[in-house]
């Protein structure tokens, strides 16, 4: 059976890696992104029968329309991946403002909630899989990452809550919690000195950042039939970051 998968934030980075992996597994993929033109170009790269959508996950009406259009144009929905997100300011807490804090929560937490709610309506009679993207920032403490960490912790909790509620209608809900991933966005943070890659890699037991394809592989597993008895899980995909509890460097 050909599965229909909707992935938010699919135009670049982890989302694009997911779109490629899910398409390779035989899914028909709807690539949703705030940058609709970029999503359209990516859909062309994948080829038929994939679909591009412009969607703003911070806007409830836009999210509802995204789900409705996917269902209408692709005749259903089997998989939702809530991947869209924005970065934190990295400012000291005393310099952080409430507007930015609220914006980060709205994109990550509210967006995941609304998309999951609407996807569950579409999946109620057929079952399906929802995958949320949490983070090590939601499982451990990262200085200055207040809004981002709170949003990602909320996503982990909401994953478990929804998994318990919707299991009876055959909807599995899981999350992944990536660590540092070698995306273009992270590369910019390294280039501008906002993060120290060498220092961070010493803190990771596996000694390196993840490749986006490695995160996509974990995402596909949780959405695939291979994970048919897995729901309510938050899978760390962080090279051992959250497991390490010793002093000093973990590798190198």
PLM region descriptions:
Residues 1-30, 162:
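Canonical Rossmann dinucleotide-binding motif of NAD(H)/NADP(H)-dependent dehydrogenases/reductases
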Residues 36-37, 55-65, 98, 213-214:
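The beta1-alpha1 cofactor-binding region of Rossmann-like NAD(H)/NADP(H)-dependent oxidoreductases
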Residues 135:
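Residue(s) in the substrate-gating loop at a strand-loop-helix junction
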Residues 91-93, 97-105, 200:
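Substrate-binding pocket helix/loop in short-chain dehydrogenase/reductase
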Residues 116, 151, 159:
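Active-site helix of classical SDR
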Residues 90, 231-252:
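Short C-terminal tail/terminal secondary-structure segment
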Residues 121, 164-168, 228:
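Alpha-helical segment proximal to the catalytic Tyr-Lys
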